[in-house]
Regions:
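Conserved ABC ATPase "signature" region
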Residues: 95, 106-121
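Hydrophobic anchor residue at the start of the ABC signature
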Residues: 139
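The feature captures the beta-strand-to-loop junction immediately N-terminal to the Walker
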Residues: 30-35
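Conserved ABC transporter NBD signature motif
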Residues: 56-71
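Helix-to-loop junction immediately C-terminal to a conserved catalytic motif
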Residues: 48
Length: 145
């Protein structure tokens, strides 16, 4: 469970997030909707531990972000456009990312790719993927993380 309490973020005196409070239950899928510049990406960056709040707190599974843990280890997210190496296949891109954490097998990577409707055996380079295929690969990345 993710619990956000009175989260505020300011840059140079300008408040970009103002007293956000919400609870996100484990096992559910959520989406953030809002106009450009409304703070959706900034909120996600806080939840992922990339940015620290000016005030307020984020608790993930009972651990306070920035105090008990630096970043959540069980949350996958796609923020903006995922960056992949265009000269490699989808599987090879995800394999390189997985090698950083040493937590996931080749079969688990292939299953994540299949789950989003792509072929893990395809040798097609990501640079030749359509936008939709790249977005699907980004979802596979979030799932495997």
């Amino acid at each position: 469970m993710i619990e956000i309490k009175d989260l505020t973020k300011s840059f140079d005196g300008v408040e970009v997030l103002s007293h956000i409070s919400m609870t996100l239950e484990k096992g559910k899928i959520y989406g953030l909707v809002g106009r450009n510049g409304s703070g959706k990406t900034m909120l996600m960056k806080h939840i992922l531990g990339f940015v620290s709040p000016t005030s307020g707190s984020i608790t993930i599974d009972g651990k306070i972000l920035g105090k008990d843990i630096d970043a959540p280890d069980n949350i996958g997210a796609i923020i903006e456009n995922p960056g992949f190496l265009p000269g490699y296949s989808g599987f090879r891109n995800l394999k390189m990312l997985a090698s950083i954490r040493h937590k996931i097998s080749d079969e688990e990577i292939k299953n994540a790719i299949r789950l989003v409707g792509l072929d893990p055996e395809s040798k097609k380079h990501v640079g030749k993927y359509s936008l939709g295929m790249r977005q699907r690969l980004g979802l596979a990345q979030a799932l495997m993380e």
